[in-house]
């Protein structure tokens, strides 16, 4: 069994971990990097794995630094389920389309300003359509229900009163 830290290792944003066994590949969170321009640029890099090879995503909560790259993941080939609690799923249904609007607005503003100064145009990280399509992957899992993926890989969402 291998656990790879893909984000939130040298920074507090971009939470994402890849759990791999011979039988399964699970992504734990798929968060957006936030902060300086250099940190945010990490969102535009290719994933360090093939999204089509991921069997499922376990989403711990709906903060954008934990779920913000799920639309990009799905657009880039992920076909599996995103496991999340009801509350997390409901919040992600608000957060991800809102994030897409922000991505589109930021790109439009950058490109309008950049046209005058000669900057290279940028594209939004993902679109509203990408965010909406990603939400179709969500599968609600009740708190305290064990998800069994293989004989050796199981997960349970516990209720946290400290952090959403």
Task: List each language-model region with its residue ranges.
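Pre-active-site segment of Zn-dependent metallo-hydrolases
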Residues: 22-80, 84-88, 95-133
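Short beta-strand scaffold segments in enzyme catalytic cores
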Residues: 14-19
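Short strand-coil-strand connectors
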Residues: 20-22, 149-151
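Conserved small/polar residues in nucleotide/adenosyl-binding loops
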Residues: 162-164
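Feature recognizes metal-dependent phosphohydrolase scaffolds
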Residues: 5-7
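Short acidic-hydrophobic, aromatic-tinged amphipathic segments that line or gate anion-handling sites
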Residues: 139-143
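Extreme N-terminal starter segment of soluble prokaryotic enzymes
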Residues: 1-2
């Amino acid at each position: 069994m291998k656990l790879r830290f893909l984000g939130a290792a040298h920074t507090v944003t971009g939470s994402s971990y890849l759990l791999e066994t011979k039988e399964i590949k699970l992504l734990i969170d798929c968060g957006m990097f936030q902060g300086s321009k250099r940190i945010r640029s990490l969102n535009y890099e290719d994933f360090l794995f093939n999204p089509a090879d991921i069997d499922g995503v376990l989403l711990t909560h709906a903060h954008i630094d934990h779920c913000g790259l799920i639309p990009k993941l799905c657009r880039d080939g992920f076909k599996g389920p995103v496991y999340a609690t009801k509350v997390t799923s409901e919040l992600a249904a608000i957060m991800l389309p809102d994030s897409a609007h922000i991505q589109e607005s930021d790109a439009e503003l950058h490109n309008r300003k950049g046209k005058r100064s000669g900057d290279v145009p940028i594209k939004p990280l993902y679109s509203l359509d990408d965010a909406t399509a990603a939400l179709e992957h969500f599968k609600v899992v009740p708190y305290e229900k064990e998800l069994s993926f293989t004989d050796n890989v199981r997960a349970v969402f516990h209720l946290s009163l400290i952090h959403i």
